[in-house]
Amino acid sequence: MTSVSLGMPAAPPPVLAPRRKTRQIKVGSVGVGSDSPISVQSMTTTPTTDINATLQQIAELTASGCDIVRVACPSADDAEALPIIARKSQIPVIADIHFQPKYVFAAIEAGCAAVRVNPGNIRKFDDQVKEIAAAARDHGTSIRIGVNAGSLEPGIMKKYGKATPEALVESAVWEASLFEEHGFHDFKISVKHNDPVIMVAAYEMLAEKGDWPLHLGVTEAGPAFQGTIKSATAFGALLSRGIGDTIRVSLSAPPVEEIKVGNQILQSLNLRPRKLEIVSCPSCGRAQVDVYTLAEQVTAGLEGMEIPLRVAVMGCVVNGPGEAREADLGVASGNGKGQIFVKGEVIKTVPESEIVETLIEEAMRIAEEMGEADGEDAVKGSPVVSVS
């Protein structure tokens, strides 16, 4: 077999814009803002009172690459569960608080890494800021000022008539000023809307008004497909301009799916190290093999590998050889056989029936070599799949 040196890039991959300069806060062990990597969050869907189920879901999220997790706290029973969850979680826990200010203090005392407060629906929130700031400071707890289009303060709604970008930003800046007035600066801000255009405009406006770390999110984004499109569109617009320090993809789907989408958005913008990527042509009348089946079988066979490896599955002679040469590993198919490329070099030609097996074997061999070089386990996570 021909020996091909894979190597690693000598310089970091290019990004579309430098990160916006912000202050840094800590959410437990995770830095948010400044030069900290952009983190990916999700929220549990289990009743917080079901401690075992909640911890199990947090473990699944952690394994999928989640950096920070949020749990709901709508009742006293939920608040009582927080100390155990915060202590046993593998990643920092944020308590999500609405309506009742007493649960903000309960979450802080429970040891949660951070608390999300909604100034639009917590009773007499402005009157509570001084005490919240003091408690958070004493316990080393950070705060997210979570402004949401669906729950703006009545005064703001009366002024603007609806949840405009200006309305969202005015609410956020006012609350930020209250915390800062009391000497508390360990907070980040979100201004969420379910319309990506309004959401992007609000974050762009907010980014000009202060150096606060920003939590990006499209609220109530919808089912998996629709929510993925909305989040990718909005996050891409902001992150490509350097705006955003932590993200949460909101989907009507299992929380693990939110992490997969969030990680892939960051990887596609070179804001997180790329993992395994399957590139496959969309197929057309020129295709001489079943590209869909080949791509699905290769993806299934490589599931669980986590290495910066691009695998191209191409179906004809037009773009096939060129695309396969550009990939780390690839196949250009035609006439009942496939040419296998590694780093631009043809290493073998195999019958069509052996393409999938050969690609998987070569990928596993490369993964082992890369794992040995890095001293790490290269088999974990899920592959990234794209269509060229």
From Swiss-Prot:
- List keywords of the entry alphabetically: 4Fe-4S, Iron, Iron-sulfur, Isoprene biosynthesis, Metal-binding, Oxidoreductase
Specify the pathway: Isoprenoid biosynthesis; isopentenyl diphosphate biosynthesis via DXP pathway; isopentenyl diphosphate from 1-deoxy-D-xylulose 5-phosphate: step 5/6
Organism superkingdom:
Bacteria
Q: Which cofactor does it need?
A: [4Fe-4S] cluster
Please name the SUPFAM superfamilies in this protein's record.
Dihydropteroate synthetase-like, Nitrite and sulphite reductase 4Fe-4S domain-like
Which InterPro entries does the record match to this protein? Dihydropteroate_synth-like_sf, IspG_bac, IspG_bac-typ, NO2/SO3_Rdtase_4Fe4S_sf
Molecular function per GO: 4 iron, 4 sulfur cluster binding; 4-hydroxy-3-methylbut-2-en-1-yl diphosphate synthase activity (ferredoxin); 4-hydroxy-3-methylbut-2-enyl-diphosphate synthase activity (flavodoxin); iron ion binding
**In this record, what's one Pfam family?**
GcpE
Q: What processes does the entry annotate via GO biological process terms?
A: isopentenyl diphosphate biosynthetic process, methylerythritol 4-phosphate pathway; terpenoid biosynthetic process
Q: Where does this protein hold [4Fe-4S] cluster?
A: 281, 284, 316, 323
Record EC number: 1.17.7.3
The note describing how and how many cofactors are bound reads: Binds 1 [4Fe-4S] cluster.
Give the enzyme's main class according to its UniProt record, as a single word: oxidoreductase
| Functional note | Converts 2C-methyl-D-erythritol 2,4-cyclodiphosphate (ME-2,4cPP) into 1-hydroxy-2-methyl-2-(E)-butenyl 4-diphosphate.
Which family would the database say this protein is a member of?
A: Belongs to the IspG family.
Give the protein's recorded name: 4-hydroxy-3-methylbut-2-en-1-yl diphosphate synthase (flavodoxin)
Per the UniProt entry, what species is this protein from, by scientific name? Paenarthrobacter aurescens (strain TC1)
Please spell out the taxonomic lineage of the organism that makes this protein: Bacteria, Bacillati, Actinomycetota, Actinomycetes, Micrococcales
